[in-house]
Swiss-Prot record:
Residues 1-41 are annotated as: Disordered. Regulates cell growth, chemotaxis, signal relay and the actin cytoskeleton. Required for chemoattractant receptor and G protein-mediated activation of the 12 transmembrane domain adenylyl cyclase. Functions as a part of protein complex TORC2. TORC2, is presumed to be indirectly negatively modulated by rapamycin and regulates actin polarization. TORC2, but not TORC1, negatively regulates phagocytosis. This protein and dagA protein CRAC, a cytosolic regulator, are both essential for activation of the enzyme adenylyl cyclase. This protein and CRAC do not function redundantly. The gene is piaA. Disruption phenotype: Cells are unable to aggregate on bacterial lawns and show impaired chemotaxis, rounded morphology and lack polarity. Phosphorylations of endogenous pkbA/PKB substrates greatly reduced including loss of phosphorylation at 'Thr-470' in endogenous pkgB. In null cells neither chemoattractant stimulation of intact cells nor guanosine gamma thio-phosphate treatment of lysates activates the enzyme adenylyl cyclase. Constitutive expression of piaA reverses these defects. dagA and piaA double mutants require both proteins for reconstitution and activation of adenylyl cyclase. It comes from the Eukaryota. InterPro entries: ARM-type_fold, Pianissimo_fam, Pianissimo_N, Rictor_IV, RICTOR_M, RICTOR_V. Residues 1-34 have a biased composition (Low complexity). Part of a complex, TORC2, consisting of tor, lst8, piaA and ripA. Additional proteins, such as 14-3-3 and heat-shock proteins, may also belong to the TORC2 complex. Keywords: Cytoplasm, Developmental protein, Guanine-nucleotide releasing factor. It comes from Dictyostelium discoideum (Social amoeba). PANTHER family: CYTOSOLIC REGULATOR PIANISSIMO, RAPAMYCIN-INSENSITIVE COMPANION OF MTOR. GO terms for biological process: aggregation involved in sorocarp development; chemotaxis; chemotaxis to cAMP; establishment of cell polarity; G protein-coupled chemorepellent receptor signaling pathway; mitotic cytokinesis; negative regulation of asexual reproduction; negative regulation of phagocytosis. The lineage of its organism: Eukaryota, Amoebozoa, Evosea, Eumycetozoa, Dictyostelia. Residues 803-914 form the N-terminal Ras-GEF domain. One of its GO terms (molecular function) is guanyl-nucleotide exchange factor activity. This is Protein pianissimo A.
Amino acid sequence: MTSSDSSVNTTSSSFGNISISSPNHSSSTPPLNNGNGNNVSASETELKKHVLYSLQCLDEKTLTLKVKLDHLNKLVELKKSIPDLNKLGISPTQLYKSVRPFIALPPKTIRTAGLRVMRYYLSNSNNVKELLDLKVQYFITRSLERDKHSEPERIQALKIIRTIMEIDCSLMPHCFVKGLVSIAENQEDNFCRVCLECLTEISIRNPQISSHCGGIRTVFDAVLDPFYQGIQESLLICILYLLSDKDTRIYIRPKSDLEIILAPLTNSFNIGVKLKGASKEKEKEKEKEDEVAMKKWTASSKAVLTLIKSWIGIISLNSDDQGLKSVVDTLRMPQIELQEKALDSIFEIFRVQLPKSIQETFGPQKATQTFNFGSETLQDLPSRTRSLRHNLLNNYLSVLLIAFIDNGLIEGLVYLGNYVANRDGMSEQEKECSKNISLKSTVLLAELLHMSNALLPPSQCAKLQTLPSLVNSAISFRLDPRLRSSSNTMVTNLHSYSHNKSSTTLMDSTLAIGLTGANKWRRIKGQDRRLDKVDDVKMKMEWHMDDNQFQQKIKDTQVLVTKDYQKWSWELMFELLEGPLNNPQHLSNTLKTKFIKRILSFLRPNKKLFSTMAWTTENLKYVRTACVALEVLISHEIGFDFLKDNKTIIQIADMLKVELDYNIKPPPSSSSSSENKKDNVRLLNPEKVLKTMSREYFTMLGTLSSNLLGLEILARNNIFDYIKPLAELPGRDDLSHLIMTSLDYNVNGASRTILQKILTSSSRVVRYLATKYLRFLLRSGVQDFSNWGVELLVQQLNDVDAKVSALSLNVLDEACDDPSCLEVLIDLKPNLLKLGKPGKSLLLRFLSSPKGLENLLQNNGFVEQEEQLWITSENATYVNAIESAVSESLSPSVWRFKEAPDGSSTSGVYLPPHFFGELAKTEKGCQLIRKSNNYQRFLKIIQDPTAKQLDKRASLIAIGHIGSSVDGYSFVKESDTIKLLIGIAEKSQCLALRSTCFYALGMISCIEEAQPIFNSFGWESPSDLNSRILLPKDLKNSTFLSVPQYQYQGSWADHSFETLPSNHFSDPIKNEIISFVGNLSSHITAEGASKNLKRLKIKYPDHFATSEILNAVFILLNTFKYRLGARRFIYDLFDVAIFSSDPYHDLN
């Protein structure tokens, strides 16, 4: 209760988008409330006296309305001190009877106050029943349906309806819902939005009454209305809730209700079509129609996208003959604009991003292509081990694929790819647009083929990959030559895109080296076998290159001809360093020339050539060649001897020393001139590090640190003695980051020591970035990470900054996918429980190791307590969390790569550790599960028809986790669980339960022993069982994506209502009045009926003033559907009866 409710006339109050204000009012009786809003203590006796006195005053006929208004406001104040009227010995019915007359009086201020009192004294179901037994609902509905001049009254009426809805929606009267429907359908009314929202909530709480009153149909209609664009998603959530379970699904008309949403998608053939010979007025009218139709088409498209982002939506749309097929058929619309919008929607559905340039997508790839991996790219290196975890989004995408393919998506994309060839008479602009659409459809088709290869079983993949319709049109000479040519082009583009996609992937999960030094500039092997072969053959040929050829190539570089580096052929230099110079003989001969000397001379800091260049993409070719040259030299003893005392290395060491000396002993502030001179000497001051190539000297040092000979050179020149303090300099985060990301950590030594120092830097930012870099090192497969990296991560758990600690915990969680890292972590015994729920989640990983389980069993009953916790609550919390994560990740805003505060990727939904799943990974853990009989408990729950859906879903996930390990699968095999789960997935009346069961089946499908059983039931998995995906072999013969047939029970005509016989009254005039009131419900007869009713009221005013006829009118309003204007007209006709001395007489 807010202060604005304390008096009918106090200050301003608001509801939704509606704000009201009333004049001030002073109460004649002091309220039981002080100025600070704190209740003044009063005994129950005094409270009872106050209440009874106010009720007595309300019943007193001689008192003025102003006095009675004061007592109505006083009752509101008194309620703040009265938790329950019955405790005072006062019946709520007594109060409602005293207040009831005031909501049927002409002054709206009095009506508003009466409504407020009623609302305040509604606290339980009994109160609601007592109130409704007094038939006040008709007058509350009238107050709700008043015009804009009665907003305070309408707000109080709406609040009463919401209060009843929240207390017990099963008691909701029909007249309330009818009133809400009439307002929600009238967009000119200020309350239409809030009434629609109430209607949506009632549809969830009490779908039966909403359906009988037309509320659910109103919700469906509003989905496509541009006026309700802001709440469209809420409306669709309501619809999905109703579709989910058999008990609520019966209130939605099979197929026809969903087709309200789908209709605009395929009924828009006339949009944009110009009328020949039409007048300007007709053209303007057509433009307006097209605008409205386009808005509905867009709303329909968005609605379908929202539906498809849920399992309930996919199953419901696939069950409807026109569901997903309507979405696919939009690709065949004649309007190019609609084709493109439809294509973009399908890109969004499958979470596929369009390339920045469609045209360049199909360009040829060069075998000699090289790539630049900056430090930012390195941070986003994909996980080497994450692919082993179950990504729930892959299950979702696999079902989307088979459902859309079954509904003709591939044929639709092929049609779009050949669209230009199928049309004559197109303008140049249309042809250009169509060509773009054709290329986009080819990209999407290629992406789907690529996706299906990973997510679909081989049998389904084979049918898809052959593309029979496209291939047939490409090779058939009976078809139009243009179509054949277009099909050939599409086939070529598909091949090109598929090839380019694999060859341009910079990194993959098989990467086994840290990308430092020269490795930053090489194409990663294993991405493209064709390019790998080309490189191997080329390297062998260059290795065995004869001396004459080699000497000629050396000359062609121009290095021996001129000292001007701009005239050198840097590409040829790079090729020589990568190839022939790896041959010791060629290297030995070259070192006798000035080739290597001039390259290293160019790199000397003091030369001010390389060191002062701008740090640009174009200039990175120099550091690329420099790193490869250093790598070649430290790979051979002769190169080592040449490099160990080279001036370039000495000058790099001096450069580091200058920077270190400056920061340790900065010049006095008075000597500004000397400071400027020293600043010019410094190549590593912040500005130069940011803007010049001097920063790349650290990359070269990283190359040297990757090899024992290189490390010896660094030690010989005391470079590590300079790097260590530079990495810890306060205020030089740039140097810390450069040093950290440049050094090589594959060799145990000073590099790892420096990284450890950086991890304990005084700068929070540096510590965070260093911890994040440990994730990169883990993913890149750096040598012996488990032996040193895990310990560093455990050290970071104690960081004072919560973000650093959370990040290290997240990286440790990922590291534990590697058994060796998990074993090291178990030995370190970190205190993970102090880190809250994420820490406990990581601790659960210990259960999957015999050693870890043994440790936890000795930890003061941790396992037993956790087991009990998971049985009572955590199982349910877990399933809610993962399903919410799936729902959230399907939101468009997170379809692109994002990083969470803990540094983790949100590009997938990976299953977190589950207590029973981790326990089942060891033999001892399985013994504990068997001893506690928990598996049998889960089986009983999923078979119990009276069990809650949440408990069933939680049990399904627990079964899936237990059955996903080799040891745990024994439980599945013993109890014939697979048959039970497939039965639920295919036949459950609860669609949400099917989706959870689908996930559980996917978990178990990673066990090879289970595959024959799945095959016997008509289900199969992709070749890679680690994908944890299980799909029906034939979707048409499976009921997995089909809603069971049901009988619609939402029609009001099929249910008994309070109705009137045709001759209800003995007086024919009254019967005629009632007949015309009934005709107002039809827009066909409404105009004539309203004229006749006006005529009859003038002629027989007394017939409109009795409570008897008012009762009959309320029955009609409660039975039939009237528009808001008609309802207000009816209330005005019978206002005398409504405001009579006893309007409740015949209602009672």
